[in-house]
Amino acid sequence: MVKPCWRIGAGMERSKINPTKVDGLTWYKDLGLHTFGEFSMAMIQANSVMEDQCQIESGPLTFNNPTVQGTFVGVYDGHGGPEASRFIADNIFPKLKKFASEGREISEQVISKAFAETDKDFLKTVTKQWPTNPQMASVGSCCLAGVICNGLVYIANTGDSRAVLGRSERGGVRAVQLSVEHNANLESARQELWSLHPNDPTILVMKHRLWRVKGVIQVTRSIGDAYLKRAEFNREPLLPKFRLPEHFTKPILSADPSVTITRLSPQDEFIILASDGLWEHLSNQEAVDIVHNSPRQGIARRLLKAALKEAAKKREMRYSDLTEIHPGVRRHFHDDITVIVVYLNPHPVKTNSWASPLSIRGGYPMHSTS
Amino acid sequence: MKHLIRRLSRVADSSSEFSIRRSTSSFRNRRGHHRLHAPPPPWSICPARRVNTVPAGHVPVYVGEEMERFVVSAELMNHPIFVGLLNRSAQEYGYAQKGVLHIPCHVIVFERVVETLRLGGFEGSGDLENLVASLLSGDELIPETTE
């Protein structure tokens, strides 16, 4: 059993207090304790630079109201580079605390404001770097955030990561999806874009048998991706593949999260939050069955391995041979994958753990071949 | 792109000395334990049409329009030249292709590239060096989508 002995720290010092491990391309924390129970985290890199980031923060969720205690979980699946997902991991939780402090509580509006300001600030960074680093305009990230507080779980999602609740039912466990996703290959996301851009016949284009916004990107909402939000970036020196042939006035992608609020019941055992890299290989029910039927220690790594075995099977190769494939090349077999399993207890684990907040960040720095 | 296809065709015309049979025997040698003086070749290739299961350490790929199936060593996948072939695949079919990876390259060129890699690289092979330079350069070979 891991004792709740964590303190907030920074950089290396923090990682000594909260030992996390790296094994080749895998980063993991097999078991830890958050305000309402245990958790397990694991990530694997497939791109030449790890584009996924994640974090878990447990303790006070405001700066001024010590009674608002809870757990914040973030999964950030970057694309076009790691800068946007890293920016979110650096900024979204402090912003959430700032907005929560204004009303001295957590709410849907607080979370949405944290998303909006994180996007706004990232776009400011893009503007600042435009003369020297214009490719920042084509970097973006999905953002999945879960907040557990006062018996409620808030799931806010921009992009196509997913949160799934495991609810015990007649001797088994049922998967209940808590997140709403924004991917052009979902009918609802396509309808939304078509209705927002009725005069643009090329707002969605099928490419490689998949729907893509402007023929480029699958997610229909994101943090970053400045080139699809502000026309000022739709010009040289941005790479031609990101430049749209026509001028646009209305942002094509939005950073607004879809937020769901669920009151937790004693039947709610755990929540799995993961980037789409996991869900392209495991169904919601397969994932909750694995968690329900396995020991808690290392459960996130177990899910990761199940997804990788499935990825290897699809390419008709052995899992052990997949592990020989280097980052970058790996992307042809699977995506970067992040998975966090948060077990739920109806009451805080230990009252005195409130004084010992937890802060763990995953995915940076990872192996880089570029 | 047309330039690259022409180059591929030209190399293909001069590659008759490399055969699948030779590749197959080299694969068998790699599995043997009694070879003296000659260490097992680091990379191998064999046609997989008559092989029911993929040998350990290998990955199947489909090559060319005819979708000829080969197995190549997992180690070979990491070679920059092979990465160039995989990037062509992602550019043509995306990362989310279902099942075995499909490499858009003439079968005969593919065999020659892999065989040359197996025999120790590209030194002194001008045509292939040019081919590889083509494979590894140019924006057209970078996947055009972002994921």
Swiss-Prot record, chain A:
Its EC number is 3.1.3.16. Mn(2+) 1 binds at residues 77-78. It comes from the Eukaryota. It holds the Pfam family PP2C. Disruption phenotype: Reduced apical hook maintenance in etiolated seedlings. The pp2c-d1 pp2c-d2 double mutant displays a long hypocotyl phenotype and strongly reduced apical hook maintenance in etiolated seedlings. Dephosphorylates and represses plasma membrane H(+)-ATPases (PM H(+)-ATPases, e.g. AHA1 and AHA2), thus influencing negatively plant growth and fitness. Promotes the apical hook maintenance of etiolated seedlings. This is Probable protein phosphatase 2C 67. It comes from Arabidopsis thaliana (Mouse-ear cress).
From Swiss-Prot, chain B:
It is found in: Cytoplasm. It comes from the Eukaryota. Induction: By auxin. The keyword Coiled coil does not apply. GO terms for biological process: auxin transport; auxin-activated signaling pathway; positive gravitropism; root radial pattern formation. Keywords: Auxin signaling pathway, Cytoplasm, Developmental protein, Growth regulation. Its main location: cytoplasm. It holds the Pfam family Auxin_inducible. Specifically expressed in the quiescent center and cortex or endodermis initials of root stem niches. Expressed in vascular tissues from hypocotyls, petioles and cotyledons. The keyword NADP does not apply. GO terms for cellular component: cytoplasm. Belongs to the ARG7 family. Plants over-expressing SAUR41 display pleiotropic auxin-related phenotypes. These phenotypes include elongated hypocotyls, increased length of primary roots, increased numbers of lateral roots, increased vegetative biomass, twisted inflorescence stems, overexpanded petals, reduced seed setting and increased basipetal auxin transport in hypocotyls. Plays a role in the regulation of cell expansion, root meristem patterning and auxin transport. This is Auxin-responsive protein SAUR41. It comes from Arabidopsis thaliana.
